[in-house]
Amino acid sequence: MKGVATDIGTIHFIGIGGIGMSGIAEVMHNLGYKVQGSDVAESYVVEGLRKRGIAVMIGHKAENLGDAAVVVTSTAIKRGNPEVELALEKRVPVVRRAEMLAELMRLKSTVAIAGTHGKTTTTSMVAALLDAGGVDPTVINGGIINSYGSNARLGASDWMVVEADESDGSFLRLDGTIAVVTNIDPEHLDHYGSFDKVKDCFVEFVENVPFYGAALLCIDHPEVQAIIPRVRDRKVVTYGFSAQADVRGDNVTPIPGGNRFDVVVRNRDGDTRRIEGVTLPMPGRHNVQNALAAIGVALEMNISDAIIATGFAKFGGVKRRFTKVGEVPVGDGVATVIDDYGHHPVEIRAVLAAAREGARAKVIAVVQPHRFTRLRDLMTEFQTAFNDADTVYVAPVYAAGEAPIDGVDAAALVAGLKQRGHRSAQVIAGPEALAATLAATIAADDMVICLGAGDITKWAAGLSEAIAKETAR
C-alpha cells in the first residue's frame, strides 16, 4: 500500500498566480496530484503554470471551485472570497499556503531559509550547491530561478529546499532539518504588533530544528547575533564576515559580473581550513554573505570543499534580483537597465552598493515605493537609503490594495531625500515621463536600476525601447 495517496481529488489553489502558491502547485502537480487554480489576472507565472498542464481560471467566482476536494488559499485571500465561501458551505477543507507547504515538507528532509531580506537569493544558492553536489533536491522558492525557468522543481532525492516566508508568522509551521536566518529587521509589524514579537518568532523557528539538524545564523546582523544566546539546545553554525563566524568570507574581490572570495571554515575543535577562490556570478557584498549561508548548508550536508569552490559556476541568479533587462545605445557605448525587487531600505541600500561597486559611470535609481504603510513606517530609513545613487527618480506609491495616507507619497520621500543631503532627487509621474527624461540625460556606461515590488518591473522591461524611441524623435 502506498504511504501517501495522490488520488484525493482536485486541489484548487485560490491565488495560484502568487509566487509562493505557484511553486507548491507545480510540485504537487509533478507529484501526481490533480491541481487547478484561479487568480485575479494573467501573468508570466500563470502562463508558466498553464504550459505545465495546470488549469488556471482568471477571476474569483464560485463556479471555479468545480469538484475540488481541497482548497488552498494564499495570505492575500480573505473570508468573503466567493470560492472560499462556497468551499466552506460545501465543507470542503480550506488550508493556508503554509500548511500545505508544511505537509509537503513532512515527506522529506528540509532546508528552510528565513529572514527579512535575501531569502529568495539564498534559497536559489542553496539549490545550486546541492545540485552541484549531486543531491537533486526538490525546490520551492519565492522567485524564478533562472536556471530552472521556474520557482519550483521536483527532485529525486529525499531533500527539499524551501523559502520560509515570515510575513504572517506562518513560517513557524515549516520545521526545517536545517534552518537558515539571514537577518531580522522590523517588517510586517502590522501582523506582529511589535519588533520583539518578530524576534521571538525567529527564535521559535530556530528551536523547531530537530536535535540532529542545525541552524545557520548570520552573525554579522546584530539582531540575529542577539538571538544566539536564546538558542541553547540546538546546533548553531554562524556565518558572515565577522572574525567570530564559523563560516567566514575573506579576501572578497569584485570581478566583472560578480565576486571572488575565500571561505575560512572553523571546525568544532577550533581548527580552521580554507576554501579558496570561490567564484560567485552575482555582484554585491550582500550576495557573498548569502553565498556563505549556502556554503554553510552544503558543509552540513557533507558536500566537498572542491564542489563548493566551483558550485556557483552555473548559478544563473534569480528573476528580478539585479536582473539585466535592457541596454540603451548611447554614443559609442551603452547604458544598462537593471530590474530589482528591492523594496525595503535595507535591500535598496545593498542593491545600490552593489551597483556602485561595479559602475563605470552614473548610478540612476528609479524607485516605486510599495505600500503606503511601509513608506510611512520607514520614511526616515528610505530617505537615507539612496546615497550610492547619483540620481533618484521616485514613482507614485504602489498601493497594493491600501488606501492613501495623507503626507505619505513620492513628493514626501523626495523632500526628505533632499533635506538629508541628496543632490539629485525628483518625482517621476510614469514610465513615459521617465523615458523622456532619461533620453535627454543618459550617458554611456550609466546604470539605471528600477526598484520595487509593484509594477515597476513593467517600467524596467520596456524602458530601453522607450528611451530609444524618445531619442529617435
Swiss-Prot record:
It catalyses: UDP-N-acetyl-alpha-D-muramate + L-alanine + ATP = UDP-N-acetyl-alpha-D-muramoyl-L-alanine + ADP + phosphate + H(+). The keyword Cytoplasm applies. ATP binds at G115, T116, H117, G118, K119, T120, T121. Pathway: Cell wall biogenesis; peptidoglycan biosynthesis. Its EC number is 6.3.2.8. NCBIfam families: murC. This is UDP-N-acetylmuramate--L-alanine ligase. It comes from Rhizorhabdus wittichii (strain DSM 6014 / CCUG 31198 / JCM 15750 / NBRC 105917 / EY 4224 / RW1) (Sphingomonas wittichii). The gene is murC.
